[in-house]
Amino acid sequence: MADAFRNQLNDPKFKEIPFEDRFAMLVDIEYSNRKNNRLKRLIRNAGFDQPEANIMDINYTSGRKLNKNLISRLATCEYISEHRNLFITGATGCGKTYMACAFGMEACKRYFTTKYIRLPDLLIDLEIARSEGSYRKVLAKYANPLVLILDEWLLLKPTEIEQKDIFELLHRRRKKSSTIFCSQYGFEEWYDQLGGDDSPLADAIIDRIAHDSYRINITSIDAEHDISMREVYGLDKMLRE
């Protein structure tokens, strides 16, 4: 606000404007600056893998069977207020991470706290925290954001201890926040990836995330000739060289 006030003092045209109007301008500028700074912090703290992701740039014509109406509805972020989850599934390179980050950016624009993390990295964080005595603090770091993006969900089958970590995290988030799951496996395969009948927690974990969830499965009409979304969005360094 101080900079804006000095600009007014140094600009002769502002001398013709009543003080009340000039003060209102300063308030508007300060309000806009604070909103912009808050948005920048939210995006920075989210740690997006693809911070350039934009919901308007999602490709609907590259052989993906995407429901544009559903994606547009999810972009309004009403699912966050409803504490509903989102499952994004599909093969490697189909655009799951890009889409999830685009939804995350929309959440930030509406000032919802958001966090992106790969599930393998999250589990490592919790393992280290357990050994250092900071488990609850680190668990809260991922339990508290209103939107949590879990990339590479169940890429590897979790150990028994990791299953307990996943259960604790999702139990804390249940009916309080929204989680976006990105997985190469279809939802029907998650139970087996969690240990199936051999795991006492598999049912409990699925129960805490499946209710009223939205689901987007990115498929290929012609897998043999379809190109990777990393190529479409120019995200693959090798493809840019």
Explain the meaning of each model-derived region.
Residues M1, R44-L66:
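Dynamic helix-loop-helix/coil hinge segments at AAA+ ATPase domain boundaries and subdomain interfaces
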Residues A2-Q50:
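Interdomain "pre-motor" coupling segment immediately N-terminal to P-loop NTPase/helicase cores
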Residues A75-H83:
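Phosphate-binding P-loop
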Residues H83-M99:
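Walker A/P-loop nucleotide-binding motif
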Residues R84, Y111-T113, N144-V147, K175-F181:
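Loop/turn-to-beta-strand initiation segments
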Residues G104-I117:
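Post-Walker A helix-loop "phosphate-sensing" segment adjacent to the P-loop in P-loop NTPases
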